[in-house]
Amino acid sequence: MSRPKVGIALGGGGARGYAHIGVLRVLQEEGVPLDLVVGTSMGAIIGGAYAAGIDLAKLEKVLSSLDLNRLLGIPYSTFQEVGTVAGRIASELFTGTDWREREQEGTRALCQFFSLFSRGLKFEDLKVKFAVVAADIDSGEEVVLREGPLDRAIAASATVPGIHYPIRVGDRFLVDGGIINRVPADVALRLGAEIVIAVDVSAPLAAEVTSSIDVLTQVEAITARELTRVKLERVRERLGERLVVLRPKLDGISMLSLDRVSAAARKGEREIRKYLAQIKALL
C-alpha cells in the first residue's frame, strides 16, 4: 500500500529560518519521509542544502562559524539596513548601475557562496524533489524554480532588495521570494504533496511603533502576515488536517540575527516534536 506524498514548505524570515535546520533534523531522525521540499529565502538556503545531501549537523556548525552578516553584506540592525539602502540610492543617483547588462561582482560572489551549500549541483541532480520560490522584479510574478544550477536559484530567492541586486535567471530578474510567498505551502500542494508541513518563521508584529521607519516596517509585516494567512487558509481548504503548520517560538531572534544559528535550530526541534505524532498518524 503506497503512502501519501509528503512535502515541506520552509518559509522565509531571515535568521529565524535557522529553525528549519532543527525541524529537518528531527524529521530525519524520526524517519519521516520527505518527497518534496519547497523553500523561500532562508528556507531556500536550508532546504537546498538538505536536498543536496549536506549533513545538517555540519551545516549548523559551518553556519555558526561564519560572520554571515559581513559575508553576505547584510546589516546587523534595521537602522543600519536603512542607512545602507539610503547610501546606495544616493550613490546611484550620480553614478547609476548597469546590473541588467553586466552581472555585478557582489552577485557573482553571492552565487559562489551559495554553491558551497548546494555542492555545485543542479536541480536535476537531486534525489529529493526541490523547488525554490522567487519574485520577478519586473512583472511582480511568483517564479517557482525547479531546474538549472541550485546556487543561482537559491541566491535569487535569498537576495535582500536594496542590499543585493536582482539576479538574472533565464530572461528574468529575480529577488527575495518572501516578498510574494513567505510560506510556500501552496507551491508544495501544486507540485503534488498530499501532506504538507509548513514552517512559518515570520517575525511577529512590533510591540512598539514610534519612528517613521517603525511604521514602514510594521506596514510591510502586516501585509506579509495577511497574505500568508490567506494562502494557508486556501491550502487548508484543500488538505484539511493534512496541512500541519509549525510556528517555532523564536523570541529574541530577529531576522538579522545571523549569529544565532544553534539557538534557532533548537527552537525548531522543540516545535516539530509537538507535531510528530500527528504527522506520523497521517502517513
Predicted region positions:
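Patatin-like phospholipase
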Residues: 1-40, 48-283
